[in-house]
């Protein structure tokens, strides 16, 4: 078995090998390094923004983004500018954004929770009321790696949920705004946008300043400082998740073109050097074909340097006994993205319990899910799909319990509650229930 062989393009594992479980665990091991200096820097910035508000925001924006303005109100990007950005997009790009947005909206509209109630025989009504969050902050990274798809995936579910005010923050280094991000904000229904970024933007959204209103939840990806700041403000506000590196796991029966599978592995490996791309297949000859395809296609990729490191350190081609075993291994890995590139993918999907998104069949490339299929691309990473879910409408809605007890119901429930309260030594609880009992 090759594992972290300095010469290997990608690791080769075999599930029959006695050391397989250990090798797989090593391959999967990813500890998000909590860099103490980053955490301390974020904490200092948050405290400063909380204390000094707009003044701190202006200073940090000048220091980190080289953007100097006299007044914090100048950091707001007017809606007219977003619409101008939208109008200036090439027609094909605008059409692609609008088509993706329509699909994302159609999918998320099916997730909307509804208030429900039921009434018991004695007239007592119980239920659950669904309400949207009042105000949400959306962080969008700036600079070269601007992802308009991220705007659509975070903003549209919030608006479908009924969030009345959605505030986008995005850094504009040297004052340069990304027109496609602003265009996406216009399409997705964002309400306000500010040219701020980093831990200072997270602080402004969490605590509020004279210019930037405080929000109830902060969503969206960011760099290590943004992640550290989101971790620290959690509890004051809600957050979506702290995302780890991208992951793809492909289960293939050996009948999909090898080049397709190689490129699917590349699609995640190109994100960064810590991204993880793994193929599970029971056909050794096909694994060799995919390895040959990787070797052939890699030199032509613009991000070949990142791909090489990612595939050599965290990628793997794994020979399994059969597709049942592949599904069992997939459940253990709990991947962010899972492709089931087989005949009758439904059969194997039924065996999957833990995955962020499941791409079924040979034509369902993971890239389609990233951009325009409709389901959300904000997915649990680092094995957290064992207990968490994709971002969705439900992340922007809350549930309140409804309890309307009838006079008759109070007689039955009052006696039960009083008995339990006295058992816990809570006399006022008991009395509160007993006062409502009809006197004999």
Curated annotation (Swiss-Prot):
<dbReference type="Pfam" id="PF00815">
    <property type="entry name" value="Histidinol_dh"/>
</dbReference>
<feature type="binding site">
    <location>
        <position position="271"/>
    </location>
    <ligand>
        <name>substrate</name>
    </ligand>
</feature>
<keyword id="KW-0479">Metal-binding</keyword>
<feature type="binding site">
    <location>
        <position position="223"/>
    </location>
    <ligand>
        <name>NAD(+)</name>
    </ligand>
</feature>
<dbReference type="GO" id="GO:0004399">
    <property type="term" value="F:histidinol dehydrogenase activity"/>
</dbReference>
<comment type="function">
    <text>Catalyzes the sequential NAD-dependent oxidations of L-histidinol to L-histidinaldehyde and then to L-histidine.</text>
</comment>
<feature type="active site" description="Proton acceptor">
    <location>
        <position position="336"/>
    </location>
</feature>
<feature type="active site" description="Proton acceptor">
    <location>
        <position position="337"/>
    </location>
</feature>
<dbReference type="InterPro" id="IPR012131">
    <property type="entry name" value="Hstdl_DH"/>
</dbReference>
<feature type="binding site">
    <location>
        <position position="424"/>
    </location>
    <ligand>
        <name>substrate</name>
    </ligand>
</feature>
<dbReference type="GO" id="GO:0051287">
    <property type="term" value="F:NAD binding"/>
</dbReference>
<feature type="binding site">
    <location>
        <position position="200"/>
    </location>
    <ligand>
        <name>NAD(+)</name>
    </ligand>
</feature>
<dbReference type="GO" id="GO:0000105">
    <property type="term" value="P:L-histidine biosynthetic process"/>
</dbReference>
<keyword id="KW-0028">Amino-acid biosynthesis</keyword>
<feature type="binding site">
    <location>
        <position position="429"/>
    </location>
    <ligand>
        <name>Zn(2+)</name>
    </ligand>
</feature>
<keyword id="KW-0560">Oxidoreductase</keyword>
<feature type="binding site">
    <location>
        <position position="370"/>
    </location>
    <ligand>
        <name>substrate</name>
    </ligand>
</feature>
<comment type="similarity">
    <text>Belongs to the histidinol dehydrogenase family.</text>
</comment>
<feature type="binding site">
    <location>
        <position position="429"/>
    </location>
    <ligand>
        <name>substrate</name>
    </ligand>
</feature>
<feature type="binding site">
    <location>
        <position position="271"/>
    </location>
    <ligand>
        <name>Zn(2+)</name>
    </ligand>
</feature>
<feature type="binding site">
    <location>
        <position position="139"/>
    </location>
    <ligand>
        <name>NAD(+)</name>
    </ligand>
</feature>
<feature type="binding site">
    <location>
        <position position="370"/>
    </location>
    <ligand>
        <name>Zn(2+)</name>
    </ligand>
</feature>
<keyword id="KW-0368">Histidine biosynthesis</keyword>
<feature type="binding site">
    <location>
        <position position="246"/>
    </location>
    <ligand>
        <name>substrate</name>
    </ligand>
</feature>
<feature type="binding site">
    <location>
        <position position="268"/>
    </location>
    <ligand>
        <name>substrate</name>
    </ligand>
</feature>
<dbReference type="InterPro" id="IPR001692">
    <property type="entry name" value="Histidinol_DH_CS"/>
</dbReference>
<protein>
    <recommendedName>
        <fullName>Histidinol dehydrogenase</fullName>
        <ecNumber>1.1.1.23</ecNumber>
    </recommendedName>
</protein>
<dbReference type="GO" id="GO:0008270">
    <property type="term" value="F:zinc ion binding"/>
</dbReference>
<feature type="binding site">
    <location>
        <position position="268"/>
    </location>
    <ligand>
        <name>Zn(2+)</name>
    </ligand>
</feature>
<dbReference type="GO" id="GO:0005829">
    <property type="term" value="C:cytosol"/>
</dbReference>
<feature type="binding site">
    <location>
        <position position="337"/>
    </location>
    <ligand>
        <name>substrate</name>
    </ligand>
</feature>
<comment type="pathway">
    <text>Amino-acid biosynthesis; L-histidine biosynthesis; L-histidine from 5-phospho-alpha-D-ribose 1-diphosphate: step 9/9.</text>
</comment>
<keyword id="KW-0520">NAD</keyword>
<dbReference type="InterPro" id="IPR016161">
    <property type="entry name" value="Ald_DH/histidinol_DH"/>
</dbReference>
<dbReference type="InterPro" id="IPR022695">
    <property type="entry name" value="Histidinol_DH_monofunct"/>
</dbReference>
<keyword id="KW-0862">Zinc</keyword>
